[in-house]
Amino acid sequence: MSNQNINITADNITGKCDLKCSYAFKYSESNSTAKNNGVLIDITYDSASVSPVIYNTEKYNVSKIMITSPSLHAFNNSSMPGEIVVEHIPVKGGNNLNICIPFISSSDSSTASDLITQVIQKVAANAPSEGDSTNLNISGFTLQNIIPRKPFFAYSTGRNDYIVFGAIDAIPL
């Protein structure tokens, strides 16, 4: 999954996204595990009894979460220190949906940055080698506290739809 060539910037906006970029979510808490894949951390997410995401009237379930370093996307022609990608699969078939949020180097803190920092620290301590896995055991771990409720960029490539939050809404780490 390489989207480094996709530059997320207000200069690239074309068209108006009225009623075709409807995104609603309600994620539950998850008892996740994480796997160290070198420059990538793969995170599991518990299945929900009700699909946590509706995008353009279609329901989606979380299939996995990835933390990458550096970012997969460019933001205003620059790479960011990292990015979280939440991959969703459609309930009734169709394109996968990927929610992408960049990380920014900052001393600021938020609930999202606290959760991501805990994931990274637990992987570093309990799964230090590539291929190692660990149970995260993070109280209150939910994507509800990570995904911004802000405007976003949207694009499609082949079998994947993307929602990407801009650098202004990056998670401070």
Model feature map: region roles:
Residues 1-173:
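Alpha-carbonic anhydrase
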